Swiss-Prot record:
It comes from the Bacteria. Transmembrane segments: none annotated. This is Putative 3-methyladenine DNA glycosylase. Belongs to the DNA glycosylase MPG family. GO terms for molecular function: alkylbase DNA N-glycosylase activity; DNA binding. Pfam families: Pur_DNA_glyco. Keywords: DNA damage, DNA repair, Hydrolase. GO terms for biological process: base-excision repair. InterPro entries: Formyl_transferase-like_C_sf, MPG, MPG_sf. Its EC number is 3.2.2.-.
């Protein structure tokens, strides 16, 4: 069963932890790709200098952050990669969760082809570990791009999260990645991951 709007309507830090173990579903050419969410980061615009919406900053790019909980915010980085976030709390609050890593579950050959243009059996050990172990890596592997920006995960048939009961794990809380510019916010323990999962991007 897919997650509903009510599930997403909570503090980003709470949602980031509760999304761990849930399953991201992405339909590509009629084939459903599935991956367990194993790493997330929370961003809270009002108080978070690492957020694109810090201090109420509002631009055309960041407008999805102010949308309804359950909306996708997909942004472009380094001129070639995408990152996928899910909006949380309430409309206008600019809170969201970055999906940092997935554990591939279903249709892994297509996931592999999208990521490396190879069958999964052709991948070396390094490639297998890195297939979805990072925010831009999972976007490549699950064909998530700017077309998915603003997509409503509560209504979409091609991008949503399933409420699957993978809950037998310990959650690690630590600092977020790549935000050294964010002053005191770089020390917030707002990154969450499943302990000992092989697909976590940074431990």
């Amino acid at each position: 069963m897919r997650l509903t709007r009510d599930f997403y309507a909570k503090d980003a830090r709470v949602l980031a932890k509760e999304l761990l173990g849930k399953v991201l579903v992405r339909e590509v050419d009629g084939i459903k790709l599935k991956g367990k969410i194993v790493e997330t980061e929370a961003y809270i615009g009002a108080i978070d200098k690492a957020s694109h919406a810090y201090g109420g900053r509002r631009t055309k790019r960041t407008e999805p952050l102010y949308g309804k909980p359950g909306i996708a915010y997909v942004y472009f980085i380094y001129g070639k990669y995408f990152c996928f976030n899910i909006i949380s709390k309430t409309e206008g609050e600019a809170e969201g969760v970055l999906i940092r890593a997935l554990e591939p579950l279903e249709n892994i050959n297509l996931i592999s082809k999208l990521r490396f243009n190879k069958e999964f059996e052709e991948l070396n050990n390094y490639q297998r570990k890195n297939i979805t172990s990072g925010p831009s890596k999972l976007c490549m592997a699950f064909n998530i791009n700017r077309d998915n920006n603003w997509e409503d995960l509560c209504e979409s048939s091609s991008l949503y999260v399933e409420d699957v009961l993978y809950n037998d794990f310990e959650i690690i809380e630590t600092v977020r990645v790549g935000i050294d510019y964010a002053e005191e916010a770089r020390d917030f323990l707002w990154r969450y991951y499943i302990k000992d999962n092989a697909f976590v991007s940074v431990k």
